[in-house]
Amino acid sequence: LELNGSFTQGGLLFGKTNSKNKVFFNNKKIFINDSGDFILALGRDEKLENLILIEGLKKKKTHKIKISKRKYKIQRIDGLPKNKVTPDQEELKRIKKESKKISISKNKFLNKTFYKSGFIWPVKGIVTGKYGNQRILNGQHRRPHYGLDIAAASGTKVISPSDAEVVLIMEDTFFN
């Protein structure tokens, strides 16, 4: 097992094993490509000690990994439209429908290693929201932020941060 990356809460790990093996992390089977490459996304509040199970053709092996704790900031944003903080029932239905499409696209496995070409910034701008930060919107505590926001003028061209294959296009979504 080879494992590299950011061993911190919210980090990303890049692994390699025999392509015939099965990899499990947090009791979930991890997709492995034909070359044995895989990615582990560590959760915002990932346990500080974790196990990776490698199941080979003849034996199983457990690998212990240590994860460092990450400190998150609190982000207060006021002046947002009320429906963006507390959507009504019709908007909640829309959000649920859009979220389902996004979730399905995120779980689509492509037997490719686009990430190996590296990453660049998709747009120049000010970072206005970071992964993991706790959000207080119009004075109301909301779930942590699970993305990276970059402010740019409306109509600014945004490029892919890495080599990629588009698996979902959605226009005029509720939040994005």
Please identify what each model-predicted range represents.
Residues G56-K61:
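Short, exposed coil/turn segments at beta-strand boundaries within extracellular/luminal domains
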Residues G36-L40, L148:
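Short strand-edge motifs at loop-to-beta-strand transitions and within beta-strands
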Residues L1-F14:
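Extracellular ectodomain segments of secreted/surface proteins
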Residues G15-K22:
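Short proline/glycine-enriched turn/loop motifs at strand-loop junctions of beta-rich domains
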Residues F25-N27, I54:
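Structural motif
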Residues K64-N176:
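Surface-exposed, glycine-biased beta-strand/turn segments
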Residues A41-L48:
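Surface-exposed, short loops/turns at beta-strand junctions within beta-sandwich domains
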Residues K28-D34:
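Short beta-strand segments within Ig-like beta-sandwich modules, predominantly Fibronectin type-III
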